[in-house]
Amino acid sequence: VTRGAGFQFAADAKAINPDITLDLLRWGEPAWVARAFTVSQEHGFNARYSWIKETLDAAYRVYGLKFHFISAEQNETDRIDESWILFLRYRLDHEVRAPYDYRKIKLVASDEVGTRNIAAQMVENASLRNAIDVIGLHYTTFGDSYTNLLNEAYGKEIWYSEGSAPCNLSELTVQADQSGLVGKNSAIDIANRIINSYYNGKMCMYEFRPAIAANYDGAYDEPKHLIAAQEPWSGFYRLDSGFWMAMHFSRFSPKGWLFVNGACYGDGEENHAIEH
């Protein structure tokens, strides 16, 4: 947990705002976990859980972090493993050697990109439905009949669990007439996606990827961020228009704020924005 910046960022953010909730999502897994699956599924599941538990334990020991959510599947999986999700829920519920109550950790699934297969499986499988608290979807502002049913009948939260951060540098795009903050992936376009994601998908959270970036000038995704920190050795950072756009939402809708469906609207169009 000390090899990358992520856990340190989380600790710094919690020091500023203790009410922040934390979600753990894996993009891969160590080779020793993958090798365990060559022995049997049981060996693989046990190895993967040991790795996750060791991470949770270390994050608490080193940084004092308590995680509220775990995304059960690997990022943007194309194959949902129901058996693993149920195994993870069972092990967390029966964990007796933990620095805090792991039974309270909620599961998010399944961080798919552009699809909602997990929702249909949850409708058909009551055990899976009971194990999962949040449906996480990537890069879509839309739900479907299954996500709507799970939200309305079963109280499952729907998250836009990975969405683009604004991708333009406002100082290079704004015009003399104060236009220019528009276009695909602009700050206004991302604001439009946040608005549309509730009206069209019942999504109550938008997670930026990335919120903080340290890409060098000219690198792929270089302008994609809320906060740019390409020179950490100097202490310099830049807040672009996306940061202030996000603040409009976070300051307007504090935790616990409720949506009034009749007062919400989004035209369902993505990759566009009001021009003035």
Spans of features found by a protein language model:
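Substrate-binding and catalytic surfaces of secreted/luminal carbohydrate-active proteins
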Residues: 53, 57, 79-276
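Substrate-binding cleft and catalytic face of glycoside hydrolase catalytic domains
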Residues: 1-124
